[in-house]
């Protein structure tokens, strides 16, 4: 059986990345999130496929087709709740995965990191267009506001927005094309995940110490397959608790009303996982400036390898950088809270301070802390 595992073409493809892969012996539970994200993607594709069988992408029937799925389709309520809350769990895992990458210096595997950031952007785009599909109040107005941001682009902005809408407002054409994109993007993401893994397995996994682990490696199976299975069980438990006990906890109440172009909701806001970026967008009074800041808040991740100044890879033995990292985490939580609040004082000024400190921490303070820690390792006095 050993020889078959290593020689048979199809089994060999599975064997190399999941069974005989040499993995560092000291990686923590923080390294589980890659496999959890793969599982989340599978759950989203499967539940999404079943939802697509019953959903109709038409402005007159979209809202009622979602109600029909929940009321009349066998276990439709469960499929919809798993899909809606699966997106939230997906983003929880995604942000923890990125946080781990920053903390342990995994961004120094540049190709793997850059493909990961592209995956983040594609996942955000998929989740953004999904918001339109139920055709509730927040779907319609969220789509109108978010797509309208493109009108800030000089000269071609207005034309570009109307081209995306397929008309002069968010309407049937917009809903149809957004459904088509929402259906195809997860499969493109799956292909990109394979490329992400290919580049990761070229270098091997990083580890908490940030030191080359080649001298001490163990096979991925059974050690890390068991460890991943535990993480998977916990993730499924959280997802099922959300989907079965409080399925609407993370939804917006406005989305339970059908879309009405004549009635604007009191507060237009995206899903919770975009609130930090939305807060950065709102904190700048100028429209173009806000859009650029929004883009910069995500695209800044591409700069992480360039901003690494420390002689050490990981933050494990760097207390000053650790402190700044946790301040950054607190800052992002503050931005998420601000994004869900109305645009009034004191929320405006808190959002502006948090937005400035977000960029300040990543671009200036963390690289300076790395240089200072280098100096402290070899003081000149």
UniProtKB/Swiss-Prot annotation:
It comes from the Eukaryota. A ubiquinone binds at residue 201. Heme b b566 binds at residues 97, 196. Heme b b562 binds at residues 83, 182. GO terms for molecular function: metal ion binding; ubiquinol-cytochrome-c reductase activity. The chain crosses the membrane at residues 33-53, 77-98, 113-133, 178-198, 226-246, 288-308, 320-340, 347-367. GO terms for biological process: mitochondrial electron transport, ubiquinol to cytochrome c. The keyword Transport applies. It is found in: Mitochondrion inner membrane. Its cofactor is heme b. Gene3D superfamilies: Cytochrome Bc1 Complex, Chain C. The keyword Electron transport applies. CDD domains: cytochrome_b_C (cd00290), Cytochrome_b_N (cd00284). Binds 2 heme b groups non-covalently. Pfam families: Cytochrom_B_C (PF00032), Cytochrome_B (PF00033). It is a multi-pass membrane protein. Its main location: mitochondrion. GO terms for cellular component: mitochondrial inner membrane; respiratory chain complex III. InterPro entries: Cyt_b/b6_C (IPR005798), Cyt_b/b6_C_sf (IPR036150), Cyt_b/b6_N (IPR005797), Cytb/b6-like_sf (IPR027387), Cytochrome_b (IPR030689), Cytochrome_b_C_euk/bac (IPR048260), Cytochrome_b_N_euk/bac (IPR048259), Di-haem_cyt_TM (IPR016174). Heme 1 (or BL or b562) is low-potential and absorbs at about 562 nm, and heme 2 (or BH or b566) is high-potential and absorbs at about 566 nm. Component of the ubiquinol-cytochrome c reductase complex (complex III or cytochrome b-c1 complex) that is part of the mitochondrial respiratory chain. The b-c1 complex mediates electron transfer from ubiquinol to cytochrome c. Contributes to the generation of a proton gradient across the mitochondrial membrane that is then used for ATP synthesis. Belongs to the cytochrome b family. The cytochrome bc1 complex contains 11 subunits: 3 respiratory subunits (MT-CYB, CYC1 and UQCRFS1), 2 core proteins (UQCRC1 and UQCRC2) and 6 low-molecular weight proteins (UQCRH/QCR6, UQCRB/QCR7, UQCRQ/QCR8, UQCR10/QCR9, UQCR11/QCR10 and a cleavage product of UQCRFS1). This cytochrome bc1 complex then forms a dimer. This is Cytochrome b. It comes from Phascolarctos cinereus (Koala). The gene is MT-CYB.
């Amino acid at each position: 059986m050993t020889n078959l595992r290593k020689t048979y073409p199809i089994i060999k493809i599975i064997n190399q990345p999941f069974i005989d892969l040499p993995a560092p012996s000291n990686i923590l539970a923080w390294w589980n999130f890659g496999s959890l994200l793969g599982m989340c993607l599978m759950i989203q594709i499967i539940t999404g496929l079943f939802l697509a069988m019953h959903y109709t992408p038409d402005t007159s029937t979209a809202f009622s087709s979602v109600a029909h799925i929940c009321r009349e389709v066998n276990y439709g309520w469960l499929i919809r709740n798993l899909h809606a809350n699966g997106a939230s769990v997906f983003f929880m895992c995604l942000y923890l995965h990125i946080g781990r990458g920053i903390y342990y210096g995994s961004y120094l595997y540049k190709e793997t990191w850059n493909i990961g950031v592209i995956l983040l952007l594609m996942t955000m785009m998929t989740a953004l267009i999904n918001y339109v599909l139920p055709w509730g109040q927040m779907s319609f107005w969220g789509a109108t506001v978010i797509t309208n941001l493109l009108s800030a682009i000089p000269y071609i902005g207005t034309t570009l927005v109307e081209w995306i809408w397929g008309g002069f407002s968010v309407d049937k054409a917009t809903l149809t094309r957004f459904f088509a994109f929402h259906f195809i993007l997860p499969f493109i993401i799956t292909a990109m995940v394979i490329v992400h893994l290919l580049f990761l397995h070229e270098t091997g996994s990083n580890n908490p110490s940030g030191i080359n682990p080649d001298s001490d490696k163990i096979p991925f199976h059974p050690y890390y397959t068991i460890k991943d299975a535990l993480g998977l069980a916990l993730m499924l438990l959280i997802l099922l608790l959300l989907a079965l006990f409080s399925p609407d906890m993370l939804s917006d109440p406005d989305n339970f009303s059908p879309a009405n172009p004549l009635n604007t909701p009191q507060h237009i806001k995206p899903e919770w996982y975009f609130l930090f970026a939305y807060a950065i967008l709102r904190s700048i009074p100028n429209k173009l400036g806000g859009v650029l800041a929004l883009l910069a808040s995500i695209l800044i991740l591409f700069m992480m390898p360039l901003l690494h100044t420390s002689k050490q890879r990981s933050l494990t033995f760097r207390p000053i950088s650790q402190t700044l990292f946790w301040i950054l985490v607190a800052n992002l939580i503050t931005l998420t809270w601000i994004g869900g609040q109305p645009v009034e004082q004191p929320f405006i000024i808190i959002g502006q301070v948090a937005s400035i400190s977000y960029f300040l921490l990543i671009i200036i303070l963390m690289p300076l802390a790395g240089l200072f820690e280098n100096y402290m390792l070899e003081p000149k006095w």
